[in-house]
């Protein structure tokens, strides 16, 4: 089991350099962000049938980055794929309190934010199959 990331990674968000959103398919965008060590972060945004957005593996954005995100739609759902992807979760939940938080296990708490539903169960109930789209990392 991988466990939680180091305490330093679970502290208040810090905005690192990031790209602009790149559209990889209709209703599907990706953004690459940096970290203070040689790994990259990839955030994926999906346009929902409601017109809102699903954010997968959130990256803290600059004000210009958030303006770009909000031009795509209103954030509705945030997916935490696993404990190493929680660095900016509390920041997003504070900025968008209406966000529904999906994660690996309902009831888990990451950085003070509770997972409201199991992402696999929600996708299954919605008859959604997850797969890696061409062009995504």
Question: What are these model-predicted stretches?
Answer:
Residues 87-88, 109-112, 122-123:
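Short, well-ordered, mixed-charge alpha-helical segments that flank or form enzyme active sites
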Residues 55, 61-104:
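Active-site metal-binding motif and surrounding structural segment of the metallo-beta-lactamase
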Residues 97-98, 111-116:
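An exposure/low-complexity boundary signal
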Residues 1-2, 93:
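Generic N-terminal simple sequence motifs
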Residues 84, 103-109, 117-119:
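Short, polar loop motifs at secondary-structure junctions
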Residues 2-60, 114-137:
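Catalytic core of the metallo-beta-lactamase
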């Amino acid at each position: 089991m991988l466990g939680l990331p180091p305490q330093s990674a679970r502290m208040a968000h810090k905005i690192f350099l990031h790209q602009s959103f790149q559209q990889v398919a209709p209703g599907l965008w990706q953004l690459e962000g940096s970290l203070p060590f040689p790994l990259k972060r990839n955030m994926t945004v999906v346009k929902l049938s409601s017109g809102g957005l699903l954010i997968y593996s959130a990256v803290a954005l600059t004000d210009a980055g958030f303006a770009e995100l909000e031009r795509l739609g209103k954030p509705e759902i945030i997916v935490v794929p696993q404990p190493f992807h929680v660095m900016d979760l509390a920041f997003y939940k504070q900025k968008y309190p209406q966000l529904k938080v999906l994660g690996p296990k309902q009831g888990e708490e990451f950085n003070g934010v509770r997972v409201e539903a199991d992402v696999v169960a929600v996708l299954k109930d919605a008859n959604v199959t997850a797969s890696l789209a061409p062009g995504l990392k």
